[in-house]
């Protein structure tokens, strides 16, 4: 029996096959917005996340336009949108809706295994593509990263452990994302940010912390580790006061 990540990747292979049968990428280029510029100061990448394998339904019927508008008004430096339908109940339509509402950098959060998914994300309005080291053979990761650059987009290369960190460093990517969630077990440990952040600081690489960030104390912890930003989904999707969360992110250390 495979891990959750194995199941997701198998589903992505089916989706990619369907895309090749039903979708023709557009050729036009368009203006993009830079996450790297946003990360020159501590940044919240605020996520539109309807559901997840670990939590089930989180905010299934969220009004994407309203949520994204609130994020931008509260000071988000970028917005992340889950486009996976099977496990996270998102869609490329959600991404497109977010693009129509917002002019800040937009991340396509999905399990990317093929160039055609990047084409689809580009057409829907993404500026940033998530590439997950754990989900890709090394050569495929390099190929997809090169394609992201070719499209004029930026990438967050996501890691969870030391082995994945070494693979990511070879790419010298725009941004590295330390995922505190183990995608094989979906368990969360904020200690991964502190452990892996030390090496990324030594390499002088731009990096963010992802998953498991719910409180002011968590923000202080990842800031002290050297993160230039945080990607936050569940805490914002269930918050009764999104503005308060953003105020907490302004804490000095």
UniProtKB/Swiss-Prot annotation:
The keyword Amino-acid biosynthesis applies. InterPro entries: Aldolase_TIM, Indole-3-glycerol_P_synth, Indole-3-glycerol_P_synth_dom, Indole-3-GlycerolPSynthase_CS, RibuloseP-bd_barrel. It comes from the Bacteria. The keyword Amino-acid biosynthesis applies. Its EC number is 4.1.1.48. Belongs to the TrpC family. PANTHER family: INDOLE-3-GLYCEROL-PHOSPHATE SYNTHASE, TRYPTOPHAN BIOSYNTHESIS PROTEIN. This is Indole-3-glycerol phosphate synthase. It comes from Bacillus cereus (strain ATCC 10987 / NRS 248).
């Amino acid at each position: 029996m495979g891990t959750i990540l194995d199941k997701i990747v198998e589903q992505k292979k089916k989706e990619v096959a369907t895309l090749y049968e039903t979708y023709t990428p557009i050729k036009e280029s368009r203006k993009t917005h830079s996450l790297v510029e946003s990360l020159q100061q501590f940044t919240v990448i605020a996520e539109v996340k309807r559901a997840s394998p670990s939590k089930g339904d989180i905010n299934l019927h969220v009004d994407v336009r309203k949520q994204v508008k609130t994020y931008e008004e509260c000071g988000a430096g970028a917005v992340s949108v889950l486009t996976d339908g099977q496990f996270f109940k998102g869609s490329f339509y959600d991404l497109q809706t977010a693009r129509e509402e917002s002019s800040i950098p937009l991340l396509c959060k999905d399990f990317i295994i093929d160039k055609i998914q990047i084409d689809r994300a580009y057409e829907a309005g993404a500026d940033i593509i998530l590439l997950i080291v754990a989900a890709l053979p090394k050569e495929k990761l390099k190929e997809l990263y090169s394609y992201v650059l070719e499209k004029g987009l930026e990438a967050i290369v996501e890691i969870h452990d030391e082995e994945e960190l070494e693979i990511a460093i070879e790419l010298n990517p725009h941004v590295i994302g330390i995922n505190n969630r183990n995608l094989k077990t979906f368990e969360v440990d904020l200690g991964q940010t502190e452990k892996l952040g030390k090496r990324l600081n030594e390499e002088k690489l731009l990096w963010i912390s992802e998953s498991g960030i719910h409180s002011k104390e968590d923000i202080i912890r990842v800031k002290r580790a050297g993160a230039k930003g945080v990607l936050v989904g569940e805490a914002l999707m269930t918050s009764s006061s999104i503005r308060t969360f953003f105020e907490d992110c302004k804490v000095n250390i």
